[in-house]
Amino acid sequence: LEPEVYSFRLLDAMIKETERRGITSYPIHIKIDTGMHRLGFQPEDVPEVCRRLKEQSGVVARSVFSHLVGSDSYIFDYFTKKQLDTFTRVAAELEAGLEYKLIKHILNSAGIERFTDYQMDMVRLGIGLYGVSASGQKGLRNISTLKTTILQIQNVPAGDSIGYSRMSYVKRDSRIAIIPIGYADGLDRHFSNGGGEVVINGHRCPIIGNICMDACMIDVTDTDAHEGDSVIIFGEELPVSELSDKLKTIPYEILTSISPRVKRVYYSCLLYTSDAADDLIGVD
């Protein structure tokens, strides 16, 4: 592992440990705080960083990087440009002080989409790997689907309640599907009682009743649904961004809330031509 170093305390500890072990030129990566105020050296720290690095041989800087605060929104473009300018200046100062070239990177997924002139030596594709645009732009295709199957369909007479605490009642004779996914799997309880939908055979069907720990109920009265049919929680027909919008949160939270007990199935795709790659990312 090659650690990021964001403070003098950590830098000194790395130097001390490499000296103790007799290690030389161990690669580290210098983080600069250009406005996020989460972790990082301040721009004015660069001369001292250079001095300490040049006085020892245990560690060597391989890259310098920073993190954008609001690259996903045009309302923060002035601040983003300020961050980019600061990083460009600081990276050049660090290279001049160390007298060798560093790998430079600052763009996250939204930055890759919106600030192409600053791709530098590397970019950091995060949520874009899931086919989700952090800035709401077109071009990325969904690559992940959360799905389950219908366990049972019950015929429920008008006036009966569905689920815990009797929070939902059917106003007509209804067909209710039970699916094995609940809040312990990452399906947020705020989607209960019509707050969310699923897709069954191409049709959107509302969640009815309170979402349980391991299951929830779906109103399929108006859908040609059968036991064993596939149920899409999110995917191509129901984007994860739509779920996050309903919860007034971000897609990251939806995706990272899926619990470890949910089975993951991975597919690989070998691309042999540039045309195939363009087709995958939606380039006309």
Feature-to-residue mapping (PLM):
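Active-site anion/phosphate-binding pocket segments in diverse small-molecule metabolic enzymes
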Residues: 7-13, 78-274
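N-terminal non-cleavable signal-anchor helices
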Residues: 24, 60, 266, 282-284
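Single conserved hydrophobic/aromatic residue that forms the stacking wall/gate
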Residues: 272-284
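Active-site-proximal beta-alpha core segment in soluble small-molecule metabolic enzymes
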Residues: 1-103, 119
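Short, glycine/acidic-enriched loop or turn micro-motifs at the edges of active sites
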Residues: 34-36, 70, 111, 213, ...
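Conserved protein kinase catalytic core
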Residues: 37-39, 73, 114, 132, ...
